Amino acid sequence: MSMDIVERINKLKEEKNAVILAHNYQPKEIQKIADFLGDSLELCIKAKETDADIIVFCGVDFMGESAKILNPEKKVLMPEIEGTQCPMAHQLPPEIIKKYRELYPEAPLVVYVNTTAETKALADITCTSANADRVVNSLDADTVLFGPDNNLAYYVQKRTDKKVIAIPEGGGCYVHKKFTIDDLKRVKSKYPNAKVLIHPECSPELQDNADYIASTSGILRIVLESDDEEFIIGTEVGMINRLEIELEKLGKKKTLIPLRKDAICHEMKRITLEKIEKCLLEERYEIKLEKEIIEKAQKAIERMLRI
């Protein structure tokens, strides 16, 4: 009897001492076969801790790069590179950084991990949505440059006495920018008792009207630990898959309502089981970065991980 694709992937993983890391926004079938699921910070830490020879990263381009930066000696593969470029990660190129560095020469630059390796190499420190406020508050400066997500910068500004300068103007995630206050009113009218959980990449107006603002790992923790039964989830719809998987493991049932059903990151959905199998079989789409970029970007990420 021929093996099914999941069995074949598991066999290849074992043969090659490979590990599969998948972001919370990945399709459900990918989440189910991953060795580790998580948000950007959790996956950064897992990538650093793994003793596998090969890391297969199911996410978008900057995530694979981050895994390579933290594991320069390991082989980091992505099942797909065509169409997996996170648009926001490319909104803060070196020339924009140069302009703001000249305007604010004393201000440290904090960049979201949702950036390219080149951008991280120019930063003083990186952050994720799970630790952005802690990272900014750890810096010995009154003013910080923060990019590329303007909504995350707003979230941080509300939690620090420092002046946060959001760069570039209008930077952000196209998925989270879809959510509006009208969406919230519409869904809330149908589920008046539901708690509203949103990601800090959502607009200031939504942040000001949410019960909780959290990274995807924070959203998971709140849903699992809360006594509440209904939640409106304001982030990419793949997160609902992750929540359902974890609730099922605990034998719990809760009502999870997407703030918008079309909140889909198309770049995250490019990965399939077939592509993972081919990636392991051929060891294709390896992430390669210049040594100098790796060394500089590593300093910025390592500094974050020490906080």
From Swiss-Prot:
Documented EC number(s): 2.5.1.72
Q: Which residues bind [4Fe-4S] cluster?
A: C86, C173, C265
Q: Where in the cell is it found?
A: Cytoplasm
Q: Using the record, list the residue span of the signal peptide; answer none if the entry has no such feature.
A: none
| Cofactor mode of binding and number, as noted | Binds 1 [4Fe-4S] cluster per subunit.
Which terms in the Gene Ontology molecular function aspect does this entry carry? Answer: 4 iron, 4 sulfur cluster binding; metal ion binding; quinolinate synthetase A activity
Q: Which UniProt keywords apply?
A: 4Fe-4S, Cytoplasm, Iron, Iron-sulfur, Metal-binding, Pyridine nucleotide biosynthesis, Transferase
Q: Where does iminosuccinate bind?
A: H23, S40, Y112, V113, N114, S129, H199, P200, E201, T216
Give the highest taxon in the source lineage: Archaea
Q: List the disulfide bonds.
A: none
User: Which cofactors is this protein said to need?
Assistant: [4Fe-4S] cluster
What's a Pfam family in this record?
NadA
Write out the function statement from the record: Catalyzes the condensation of iminoaspartate with dihydroxyacetone phosphate to form quinolinate.
Entry's family note: Belongs to the quinolinate synthase family. Type 2 subfamily.
Instruction: Kindly provide the name given to this protein in its UniProt entry.
Output: Quinolinate synthase
Q: Which organism is it from?
A: Methanocaldococcus jannaschii (strain ATCC 43067 / DSM 2661 / JAL-1 / JCM 10045 / NBRC 100440)
